């Protein structure tokens, strides 16, 4: 289906203006207003980071969500992401969920448009309408998600399937609508408008990122999702995303997610009236045969658009085996320990982990002045004065969305064939010369990352030729003889991003080689200073360029006068009964792809249903302590660290915790092995790490053992050795040297913290366990040691040692 010329032209040049970038004061005011109703929740606000497949239920046994790891076939996710990536565009409609900024988000499928200025309601979204020929690319991923949903929540799936009007189904599934989000960290919200009797599904289609977990804000649970992961969940619970975890400022990342749901308003009487009106109108057109011949009214249930009630969960590290699919073999045993550990007055957590699950006066949280804005990755940078267009993040990210408009297939609809041919030739010539020079540079230095632009080269002349053609393409798209300054800004930004991508994708150059900054400088030469090169050229070259410029202008004007832009009915005015015209059969056998139902059966085979059985026998827990390397009566931090460290703000902040001072004043924990502890049917034994017993147990707890094993290979081997002793799972209790808010901190604060944190925690380990120069690791370093499957991370709240508990399955990954 050809794109609508008028709409596309408006979109091409719809870039943020200088005013739209707003002053810092306006941005701050907008942010403060947005987070009042939609706050951001960081990783620190939760107790559990859940990494594996599992079924998460609330305090009354109702499903919050079912997460399935790598549940989508690669081909299905890839096909869908390739099409849907362009659906996520800058939109102010969801700015309140993005700290007052416009996120990259969009909808596809069908939508009701209630409360929208769009005149015609209850129909295809503009994206599906404009991409109807390519739309079947989403069918596999929609089918696979639907079958996963049906297998894990059959009653909800059936209720949704029975309610959705057939005319607005996506490929026969119980989904009417897709919401596509790109690089969008959402603040706390519920999905208003989703069908109350069903669930929503979210899939991560593509990305390279860390963090950005799906957080269930009222339950203290984060679900980490990576590409191909799927979660079926109650979207009427408040949910959000945690911070993106960047190692350094400006680190590149991407993330594309898709939410699948039934938009309940499409099943309300007003929508049915619209379907019938369009159907009756279509009957007057004898040349049109609708795909759907009648509209069957269905019972839509009661949709109140209210948040789901919250029935809290008591969390502990032993809660994880109760929900993780790969640990269901030890779920009943874990529930025994969990119930005892979370009972009022219980001290089991201190016995097993060395400290309680929560400490009220532990290391204090950061003030807002020390943190980055939650949506800071999208914030605009100051305008660059180095070149011909604005290099703000907002301008460049908008251009990334629109660079497709300079592809030949798009241009063929809007400029003359003659001008299009000139564009192809000029673009191809420049890329050929760039490629030739880049090959020569790599031959001299294979490690080279930067392209050396030679102003007297043939490539430089070809670039100016391409710019001449590009200028006429711009005017051809505008349909006029001169462009406004803001239109030039928009076009040249898009032009530079397009060429940068072409060098990377077609010539396999690093993105930084032909950087936007480099292209910007050369565009400035062309737009503002190119004449100084022209006057120094030989007369014959000047004549050639003048004649070429005239030919390009004539080619552009020929396209404007020849009726090349034949208009068709656009989406806004489309009033036809075109429901399901985009649908078609997808032949999985022909592609040799596993049918969705069989795939879902395999993926969900370990999903637990029903209540956990009661454990009758004894639950045996082995707690392993570090060998006592030395006896330490007390540590005087004033004598142990330099005055520079002691006087730093970060050291003072860490030492301000009363809980820290209790640790410093307490007796060493491992001078001798504690006696065994029996609590109901739970039996807890202790061992030093160099003298592990040989008899089997249900669970092994490694209490700060790895901190006294500095070698990573040996530490990893020790986890494997411990896992061989238990039938259930291993709990790896260790200090995370990075503070809980690490990835939300400003760079300067992070650097100050890094300078003192290892020494601080080493002092506490020396007091608590007698460990000399403890190896305190980051979360990433700890998780890299795990040789099998890390199911989750539990964070002891307010812990003075910043203690975390990684729950490790004994079996190796499949």
Swiss-Prot record:
Primary localisation category: nucleus
Residues under site feature: Involved in J base recognition, conferring specificity towards J-DNA: 525
Region: Thymine dioxygenase, residue numbers: 62-264
UniProt binding sites for Fe cation: 189, 191, 239
Molecular function per GO: DNA binding; metal ion binding; thymine dioxygenase activity
Positions that bind 2-oxoglutarate: 255
Compartment list: Nucleus
Superkingdom assignment: Eukaryota
Keywords: Dioxygenase, DNA-binding, Iron, Metal-binding, Nucleus, Oxidoreductase
One GO CC term, this protein: nucleus
Cofactors: Fe(2+)
Region (DNA-binding JBP1 domain): 392-561
EC number(s) on file: 1.14.11.6
Cofactor comment text: Binds 1 Fe(2+) ion per subunit.
Reaction catalysis annotation: thymine + 2-oxoglutarate + O2 = 5-hydroxymethyluracil + succinate + CO2
Coiled coil: none
Gene Ontology BP terms: base J metabolic process
InterPro entries hit by this protein: 2OGFeDO_JBP1/TET_oxygenase_dom (IPR024779), DB_JBP1 (IPR041241), DB_JBP1_sf (IPR043111)
Top-level class of the enzyme under EC nomenclature: oxidoreductase
Biological function: Dioxygenase that catalyzes the first step of DNA base J (beta-d-glucosyl-HOMedU) biosynthesis by converting thymine to 5-hydroxymethyluracil (HOMedU). DNA base J is a hypermodified thymidine residue found in the genome of kinetoplastid parasites, which is localized primarily to repetitive DNA, namely the telomeres, and is implicated in the regulation of antigenic variation. Also specifically binds to base J-containing DNA (J-DNA).
Domain notes per entry: The DNA-binding JBP1 domain (DB-JBP1) is necessary and sufficient for binding to J-DNA.
Family under the similarity heading: Belongs to the TET family. JBP1 subfamily.
Oligomeric form and interacting partners: Monomer. Binds to DNA as a monomer.
Listed name of the protein: Thymine dioxygenase JBP1
Name of the gene encoding the protein in the UniProt record: JBP1
């Amino acid at each position: 289906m050809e794109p609508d010329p008028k709409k596309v032209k408006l979109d091409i040049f719809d870039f943020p203006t200088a005013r739209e970038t707003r002053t810092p004061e306006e941005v701050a005011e907008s942010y403060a207003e947005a987070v009042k109703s939609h706050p951001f929740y960081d990783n620190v606000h939760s107790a559990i980071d859940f990494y594996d497949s599992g079924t998460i239920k609330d305090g009354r046994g109702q499903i919050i969500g079912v997460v399935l790891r790598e549940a989508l076939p690669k081909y299905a996710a890839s096909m869908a992401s390739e099409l849907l990536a362009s659906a996520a565009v800058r939109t102010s409609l969801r700015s309140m969920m993005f700290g007052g900024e416009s996120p990259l988000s969009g909808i596809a499928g069908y939508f009701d448009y209630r409360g929208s200025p769009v005149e015609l309601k209850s129909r295809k979204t503009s994206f599906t309408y404009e991409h109807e020929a390519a739309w079947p690319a989403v069918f596999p991923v929609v089918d696979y998600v639907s079958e996963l949903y049906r297998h894990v929540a059959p009653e909800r799936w059936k209720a949704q399937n029975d309610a959705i009007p057939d005319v607005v189904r996506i490929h026969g599934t119980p989904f009417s609508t897709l919401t596509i989000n790109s690089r969008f960290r959402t603040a706390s919200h519920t999905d208003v408008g989703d069908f109350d009797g069903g669930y929503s599904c979210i899939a991560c289609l593509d990305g390279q990122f860390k963090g950005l977990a799906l957080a269930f804000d009222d339950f203290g649970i984060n679900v980490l999702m990576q590409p191909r992961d799927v979660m079926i969940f109650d979207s009427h619970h408040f949910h959000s995303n945690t911070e993106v975890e960047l190692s350094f400022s400006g680190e590149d990342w991407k993330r594309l997610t898709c939410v699948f749901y039934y938009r309940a308003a499409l099943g309300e009487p007003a929508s049915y009236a619209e379907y019938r009106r369009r159907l009756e109108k279509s009957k007057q057109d004898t040349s049109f045969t609708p795909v759907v011949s009648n509209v069957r009214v269905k019972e839509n249930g009661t949709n109140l658009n209210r948040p789901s009630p919250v029935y809290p969960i008591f969390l502990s590290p032993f809660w994880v085996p109760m929900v993780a699919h790969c640990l269901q073999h030890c779920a009943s045993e874990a529930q025994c320990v969990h119930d005892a550990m979370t009972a009022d007055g219980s001290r089991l957590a201190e016995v097993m982990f060395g400290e309680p699950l929560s400490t009220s006066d532990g290391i204090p949280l950061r003030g807002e002045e020390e943190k980055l804005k939650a949506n800071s990755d999208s914030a605009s940078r100051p305008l660059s004065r180095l070149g011909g267009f604005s290099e703000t993040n907002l301008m460049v990210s908008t251009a990334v969305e629109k660079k497709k408009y300079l592809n030949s297939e798009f241009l063929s609809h809007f400029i003359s064939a003659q001008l299009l041919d000139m564009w192809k030739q000029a673009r191809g010539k420049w890329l050929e010369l760039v490629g030739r020079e880049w090959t020569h540079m790599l031959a001299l230095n294979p490690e080279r990352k930067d392209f050396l632009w030679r102003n007297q080269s043939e490539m430089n002349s070809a670039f100016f030729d391409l710019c001449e053609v590009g200028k006429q393409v711009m005017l051809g798209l505008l349909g006029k003889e001169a462009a406004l300054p803001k239109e030039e800004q928009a076009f040249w930004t898009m032009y530079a991003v397009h060429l940068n991508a072409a060098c990377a994708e077609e010539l396999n150059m690093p993105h930084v080689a032909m950087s936007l900054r480099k292209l910007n400088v050369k565009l400035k030469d062309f737009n503002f200073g190119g004449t100084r090169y022209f006057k120094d050229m030989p007369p014959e070259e000047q004549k050639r360029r003048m004649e070429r410029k005239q030919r390009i202008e004539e080619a552009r004007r020929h396209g404007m006068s020849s009726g090349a832009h034949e208009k068709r009915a656009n989406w806004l005015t489309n009033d036809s009964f075109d429901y399901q015209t985009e649908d078609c059969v997808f032949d999985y056998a022909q592609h040799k792809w596993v049918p969705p139902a069989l795939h879902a059966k395999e993926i969900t085979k370990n999903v637990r249903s029903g209540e956990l059985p009661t454990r009758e026998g004894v639950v045996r827990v082995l707690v392993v302590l570090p060998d006592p390397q030395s006896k330490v009566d007390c540590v005087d931090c004033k004598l142990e660290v330099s005055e520079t460290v002691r006087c730093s703000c970060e050291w003072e902040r860490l030492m301000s915790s009363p809980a820290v001072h209790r640790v410093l004043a307490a007796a060493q924990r491992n001078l001798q092995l504690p006696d065994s502890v029996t609590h109901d049917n739970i039996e807890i034994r202790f061992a030093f790490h160099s003298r592990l017993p040989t008899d089997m147990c249900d669970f092994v707890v490694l209490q700060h053992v790895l901190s006294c094993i500095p070698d990573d290979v040996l530490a990893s081997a020790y986890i494997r050795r411990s896992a061989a002793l238990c039938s259930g799972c291993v709990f790896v209790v260790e200090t995370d040297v990075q503070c809980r808010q690490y990835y939300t901190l400003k760079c300067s604060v992070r650097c100050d913290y890094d300078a003192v944190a290892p020494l601080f925690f080493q002092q506490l380990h020396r007091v608590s366990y007698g460990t000399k120069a403890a190896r305190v690791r980051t979360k990433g370093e700890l998780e890299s040691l795990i040789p099998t499957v890390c199911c989750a991370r539990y964070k002891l709240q307010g812990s003075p040692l910043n203690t975390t508990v990684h729950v490790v399955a004994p079996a190796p990954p499949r």
